[in-house]
Swiss-Prot record:
SMART domains: RHOD
GO cellular component, one term: cytoplasm
PANTHER family: FAD-DEPENDENT OXIDOREDUCTASE, THIOSULFATE SULFURTRANSFERASE GLPE
Name of the protein: Thiosulfate sulfurtransferase GlpE
Originating species: Pectobacterium atrosepticum (strain SCRI 1043 / ATCC BAA-672)
Taxonomic path: Bacteria, Pseudomonadati, Pseudomonadota, Gammaproteobacteria, Enterobacterales
Encoding gene per record: glpE
Length: 105
């Protein structure tokens, strides 16, 4: 994969249920308030450790607030050698609205 793929909330939820990796790029306060269970909070500070410990062949889904910033982050992960990276359209706002039961603080 040379470029990330944008996926819907429903596709992301299905992949998450199958064990897909979710990385959340929102600010620390937003992440602490609520996030996808099991998501990794990815920041400039946590990025090096995430990359060092990553399985580059495992699909990675990037979530932000509304699905815009995640596109740049997804493309960056592709440039770092990740094989399958997805940007979640609608972001966490859409996830929380559609799947409130699959949101944790």
């Amino acid at each position: 994969m040379e470029q990330f793929e944008a996926i819907s909330i429903e596709q992301a939820h299905s992949r998450w249920q199958e064990g897909g990796v979710v990385v959340d790029i929102r600010d620390p306060q937003s992440f602490a308030a609520a996030h996808v269970p099991g998501a990794t909070h990815l920041t400039n500070e946590t990025l090096p450790d995430f990359v060092r410990g990553a399985d580059f062949e495992a699909p990675v889904m990037v979530i932000c607030y509304h699905g815009i910033s995640s596109r740049n982050a997804a493309q960056y992960l592709i440039s770092q050698g990740f094989d399958s990276v997805y940007s979640i359209d609608g972001g966490f706002e859409a996830w929380q609205h559609r799947y409130p039961q699959d949101t944790q603080a």
